């Protein structure tokens, strides 16, 4: 009796695994998306030089292109790498521009897709962001930003299938990006960029 139950359980697991594998093969393990993303920074910073609560640094909002490459290990689980080119950002102090910098923010996420293969497929993700900061031009060269930032990233989104390969996508991310502003005299301010990224795009599965 025990052998029969064990055999039945093994057969059931094999059938489920075969079904999941067949679905993945049918859709293909790779998904590439191109999105237009609006980046809206949180813009929280310490008062500059301790001069007062009103003297704060802000980073401008921006809409930018984004390339996302996902690999599905199973129909439900996927890893997504998010890429773009270095983005030029404006820095302001109490509304007056004081300089610019460029940032490159690749992000790696692990995703869970709730209804793979369905017409509407929502997902959530979590991972890590690495932001490389370069070409810093602040206060006529007298101030610098830290060259890199590592932080957490959270994601929620949904795919709307057009056919077996093409889909439309809506995606929202919250990313932790932080940096210190330094001068020769010491730290000028600590900035929490921590942006929301809201994107729409198209995906191709193969």
Predicted features along the sequence, with ranges:
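Short glycine/proline- and aromatic-enriched beta-strand/turn motifs that initiate or cap beta-hairpins
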Residues: 21-68, 134-135
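Outer-envelope beta-barrel architecture signal
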Residues: 4, 26-30, 75-77, 118-122, ...
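Outer-membrane beta-barrel translocator domains and adjoining extracellular loop/strand segments
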Residues: 44-51, 90-97, 133-142, 180-187
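Cleavable N-terminal export/targeting peptides
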Residues: 1-28
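Hydrophobic alpha-helical segments of small multi-pass membrane proteins
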Residues: 106-108, 125-130, 147-158, 172-174
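Gram-negative (and chloroplast) outer-membrane scaffold detector with strong preference
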Residues: 36-40, 68-138, 195-205
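Predominantly the C-terminal beta-signal and adjacent terminal strand-loop region
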Residues: 88-90, 163-206
